[in-house]
């Protein structure tokens, strides 16, 4: 049996139950820095970002009610680092619903937004947004020229994804310049759009993300508007650790010196850096030999959670 697929078979039933349970459990330069490393942490990176600010400038491209379900596809504006990004979102909810629990359903690498109808049929209001910016699709998030690093097909389009190095090869100096920050900011803006829907109960918001959607789920778990998250096949420990095969149980253990850009990324942007600051009830699922990240470091991530 393919071990990657085994958890997926049970995921729909399990994730639904998990989100219900988890929600019930959860009633530029940076002035501040981590005392030990003198590097910024995720809360410092995000303290000046307001995901609610500015007009959505909603442009509805599809709207219908069918078989008792209301559907809406629309573009909204996200204001990030001085740029206006047009984010494509899909929304569905039972027609006439009131005070419905809200769900952010976040897609994986190179994928696109999709509504999980199992949740809609069970009474949830579901929002799914595009952050990959794949332009071959009829509708996709539109990154301006200055935000070309948001396109997952950046290389094909003449851009570069930004992690611990800038496109010119220099070391990362500003965490907000990374692709990861951009995708997280877009996600938080889409959450604001979900909360703006009349059918949604803002006190009951959950989110689940698959693969890279699970990877950026760690940041969303820090957002106080979210009560519960599920991250599956998105575990972090990619930059530096997977990139350089720095496996925890290498024998002998080998760990090349980290560059300044890697140190900054790992402190301020990496998914696992968010663990000590997550306020949402959290569930994490992953295959024991999933190549996506440093699965063997799961214990370190859990140890970092608030007790």
Regions found by a protein language model. Name each.
Residues 51-97:
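N-terminal cap/lid segment of alpha/beta-hydrolase-fold proteins
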Residues 278, 284-286:
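Short beta-strand/loop motif that positions the catalytic acidic residue
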Residues 188-253:
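Primarily recognizes the serine-hydrolase "nucleophile elbow" in alpha/beta-hydrolase
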Residues 291-297:
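Conserved alpha/beta-hydrolase "acid-adjacent" motif
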Residues 88, 98-108:
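Short beta-strand element of the alpha/beta-hydrolase
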Residues 114, 118-120, 125-185, 236-251:
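Cap/lid segment of the alpha/beta-hydrolase catalytic domain
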Residues 260-274:
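Active-site nucleophile elbow and catalytic-triad environment of alpha/beta-hydrolase enzymes
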Residues 13-27:
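Bacterial N-terminal signal peptides
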């Amino acid at each position: 049996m393919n071990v990657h697929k085994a958890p997926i078979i049970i995921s729909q039933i399990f994730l639904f139950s998990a989100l219900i349970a988890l929600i019930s459990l959860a009633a530029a330069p940076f002035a501040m820095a981590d005392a030990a490393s003198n590097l910024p942490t995720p809360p410092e990176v995000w303290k000046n970002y307001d995901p609610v600010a500015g007009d959505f400038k909603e442009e509805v491209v599809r709207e219908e009610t069918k078989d008792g379900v209301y559907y809406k596809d629309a573009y909204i504006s996200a204001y990030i680092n001085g740029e206006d990004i047009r984010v494509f979102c899909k929304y569905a909810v039972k027609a006439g619903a009131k005070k419905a629990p809200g769900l952010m359903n976040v897609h994986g690498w190179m994928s696109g937004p999709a509504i999980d109808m199992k949740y809609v049929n069970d009474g949830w209001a579901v929002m799914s947004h595009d952050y990959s910016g794949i332009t071959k699709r009829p509708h996709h998030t539109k990154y301006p020229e200055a935000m070309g690093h948001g396109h997952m097909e950046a290389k094909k389009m003449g851009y570069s994804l930004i992690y611990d190095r800038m496109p010119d090869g220099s070391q990362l100096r500003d965490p907000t310049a990374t692709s990861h920050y951009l995708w997280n900011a877009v996600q938080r803006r889409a959450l604001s759009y979900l909360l703006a829907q009349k059918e949604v109960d803002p006190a009951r918001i959950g989110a689940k993300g698959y693969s890279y959607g699970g990877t950026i789920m760690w940041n969303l778990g820090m957002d106080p508007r979210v009560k519960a998250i599920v991250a599956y096949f998105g575990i972090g420990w990619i930059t530096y650790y997977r990139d350089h095969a720095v496996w925890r149980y290498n024998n002998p253990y080998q760990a090349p010196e980290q560059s300044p850009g890697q140190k900054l990324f790992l402190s301020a942007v990496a998914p696992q850096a968010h663990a000590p600051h997550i306020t949402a009830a959290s569930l994490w699922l992953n295959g024991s030999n999933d190549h996506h990240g440093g699965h063997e470091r799961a214990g370190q991530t859990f140890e970092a959670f608030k007790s």
